[in-house]
């Protein structure tokens, strides 16, 4: 992984505008790092014009560099269109893990009393997505069938990364699949979670069935949690967890490919929101999630890069705590004004830290 190079994956509409704001935080005069930022235009027009060739080029560059920051993109509905760039990127970099983290934003009232961060670590491949489906007539009735597949290597990647993340953040690994009903299929993930727990004996581990995981989320709100999950379980769970914190503005999404040692080899970060076409060009959209995505990405670099990521993350949350907020969080700051303030605070933090 080349921590001095971040592949920039441009997107659509307000998603692209927010990416540009996040990139301002990565300038040398802000974080003191000379980063290479090769750019690839993954807007819908570019993907159509190149028949997705630009996406394949971006995937190759991402795989070589190891770090990528992606704007939100439009996925057209037609089956004969270019489809989702995320699917191509995921397949070509070998991404097996998706991590989405919900966290409290100062001054924003969460739902149900959740407090500490919750990270959902889900399979990026297999399961219900990509399953083979068909229907057959059965007398006067009709039957539907589906054949799903998950692999032990992917279960191991999800479990191991979940425990690594919990170890790094002081969280508890919580939850699990419905292995009592499906001991062969869903039990595969449970076996790998148990094995990862043995490799990380200092990480608190509380296995739960997936239905109990949903039910117990609010009552376990005092502890930071990491929840490894199957593909569809995690997709649904993250759609619940992120809004529980009152806003998804404090959440980023990471696609991760692991090496043979089960360590991150390639990481692509993006905001956990869409292209917000109605906000395009108005300078009112909240850039926080995109800025935090960039900060999270820096956390996979060397020590100096990690420090820059921490400074950006703290500056972002402290700005909100001091009342500098965009309209969606009840404030009056515009997109550029908020980013300006995060830049000022980030530079100030890094200057102070360098003197300690």
Regions found by a protein language model. Give the residues of each.
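N-terminal beta-loop-helix "entrance" segment that forms/cooperates
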Residues: 33-56, 217
């Amino acid at each position: 992984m080349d921590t001095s190079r971040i592949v920039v994956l441009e997107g659509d509409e307000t998603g692209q505008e927010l990416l540009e704001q996040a990139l301002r935080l990565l300038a040398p005069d802000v974080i003191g790092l000379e980063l290479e930022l090769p750019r690839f235009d993954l807007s819908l027009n570019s993907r159509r014009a190149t028949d997705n060739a630009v996406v394949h080029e971006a995937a190759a560059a991402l795989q070589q560099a190891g770090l990528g920051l992606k704007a939100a993109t439009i996925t057209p509905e037609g089956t004969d269109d270019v489809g989702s760039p995320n699917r191509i990127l995921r397949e070509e970099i070998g991404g097996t893990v998706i991590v989405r983290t919900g966290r409290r934003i100062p001054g924003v009232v969460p739902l149900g009393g959740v407090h500490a961060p919750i990270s959902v670590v889900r399979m990026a491949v297999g399961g219900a997505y990509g399953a083979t489906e068909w229907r057959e007539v059965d007398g006067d009735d009709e039957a539907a069938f589906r054949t799903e597949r998950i692999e032990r290597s992917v279960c191991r990647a999800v479990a191991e990364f979940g425990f690594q993340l919990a170890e790094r953040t002081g969280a508890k690994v919580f939850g699990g699949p419905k292995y009592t009903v499906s001991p062969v299929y869903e039990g595969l993930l449970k076996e790998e979670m148990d094995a990862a727990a043995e490799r990380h004996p200092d990480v608190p581990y509380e296995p739960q069935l997936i239905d109990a995981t949903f039910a117990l989320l609010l009552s376990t709100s005092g502890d930071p949690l990491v929840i490894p999950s199957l593909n569809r379980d995690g997709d649904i769970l993250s759609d619940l967890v992120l809004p529980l914190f009152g806003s998804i503005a404090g959440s980023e999404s990471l696609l991760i490919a692991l090496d043979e040692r089960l360590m991150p080899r390639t990481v692509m970060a993006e905001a956990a929101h869409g292209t917000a076409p109605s906000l395009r060009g108005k300078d009112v959209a909240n850039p926080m999630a995109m800025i935090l995505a960039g900060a999270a990405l820096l956390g996979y670099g060397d020590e100096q890069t990690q420090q820059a990521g921490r400074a950006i993350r703290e500056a972002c949350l402290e700005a909100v705590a001091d009342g500098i907020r965009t309209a969606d969080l009840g404030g009056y700051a515009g997109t550029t004004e908020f980013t300006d303030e995060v830049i000022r605070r980030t530079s100030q933090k890094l200057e102070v830290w360098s003197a300690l």
